[in-house]
């Protein structure tokens, strides 16, 4: 199904934004290498432009890429009935557009929460998402944000097919164990032995980096390094789905590596706590950047 596309270019870096589908950065290509995940059903998602009340609905509308989950994240609840937040799939309004930058706006159905977000390609090698959330209502509101930044495509698949895999450089942080739905669990958390080197044998797994000392994670493939840095978000979720899940809709075909800065170190949603209480007129501002550099020894 077609959706209006905005193409941004900065030298060797090309990004495509879909305003009608959560303002998602649906693809990012650097020097001919596609970096962001793309689902097998990306050409025929269901009911695009609508928020989802369940994980199954959300996944069926997800083409892949990088989008903002807001003003809630993770599982739905009575206070926030949308999986991954109402803004993650619904249309945004374009307010500014140039060759390397687009600015967009979104407001909640009750107009209480207003989000201003921009995508900008920088120096032919970086993309930056800058976001400001404002509570325009008369009462305080709990807010959760997550950058649903999912690497995949050639960046991941070529590394897996070569046998070298993808390695991660992680900051010092507390690791928190989560189940595959993102819910906290008493299991021993996966630490460096799982996340430092990812291959076809890596199980489907989710972990949280709680209060990292440095807000930076690098993913290394044989061709390039993608370094994600962020500010205004205290934690990050890590998600690996490298063909390990064989049940529908994954069918062993989805290659996704999530590095997801977030306000909240779990996927339990507003009902699970961990949101930021925004009073009337208060704002929350965040910045997340993905920088592409050649792998060591590459020009």
Task: Report the location of each language-model feature.
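Beta-strand-rich interaction surfaces with strong enrichment in secreted/lumenal proteins
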Residues: 105, 116-119, 247, 273-278
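Active-site/ligand-binding surface loops and adjacent short beta/alpha elements
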Residues: 150-233
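Beta-strand-rich N-terminal accessory domains
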Residues: 1-59, 105, 212-235, 282-297
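Extended, compositionally biased flexible segments
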Residues: 49-91, 281
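Acidic/His-leaning functional-site neighborhoods
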Residues: 82-97, 202-273
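Extended, loop-rich substrate-binding clefts of extracytoplasmic carbohydrate-active enzymes
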Residues: 1, 9, 76-124
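C-terminal structured interaction module
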Residues: 258, 263-299
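Acidic, contiguous internal or C-terminal segments within carbohydrate-active enzymes
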Residues: 8, 24, 106-153
């Amino acid at each position: 199904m077609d959706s209006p596309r905005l193409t941004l270019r900065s030298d060797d870096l090309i990004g495509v934004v879909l305003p009608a589908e959560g303002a998602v950065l649906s693809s990012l290509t650097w020097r001919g290498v596609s970096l962001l995940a793309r689902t097998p059903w990306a050409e025929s998602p269901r009911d695009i432009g609508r928020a989802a009340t369940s994980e199954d609905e959300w996944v069926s509308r997800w083409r892949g890429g990088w989008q903002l989950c807001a003003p809630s994240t993770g599982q739905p609840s009575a206070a926030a009935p949308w999986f991954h937040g109402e803004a993650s799939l619904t249309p945004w309004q374009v307010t500014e557009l140039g060759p390397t930058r687009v600015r967009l706006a979104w407001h909640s159905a009750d107009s209480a929460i207003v989000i201003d977000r921009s995508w900008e390609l920088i120096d032919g090698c970086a993309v930056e998402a800058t976001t400001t959330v404002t509570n325009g209502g008369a009462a305080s509101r709990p807010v959760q944000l997550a950058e649903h930044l999912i690497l995949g495509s050639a960046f991941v698949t070529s590394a897996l097919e070569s046998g070298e895999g993808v390695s991660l450089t992680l900051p010092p942080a507390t690791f928190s164990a989560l189940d595959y739905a993102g819910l906290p669990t008493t299991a021993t958390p996966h630490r460096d032995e799982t996340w430092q080197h990812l291959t076809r044998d890596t199980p489907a797994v989710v972990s949280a980096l709680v209060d990292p000392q440095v807000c930076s994670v690098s993913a290394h493939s044989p061709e390039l390094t993608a370094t994600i840095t962020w500010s205004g978000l205290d934690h990050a979720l890590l998600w690996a789905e490298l063909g390990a899940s064989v049940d529908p809709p994954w069918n062993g075909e989805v290659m996704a590596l999530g590095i997801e800065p977030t306000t909240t170190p779990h996927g339990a949603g507003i009902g699970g706590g961990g949101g930021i209480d925004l009073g009337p007129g208060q704002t929350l501002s965040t910045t997340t950047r993905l920088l592409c550099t050649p792998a060591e020894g590459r020009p």
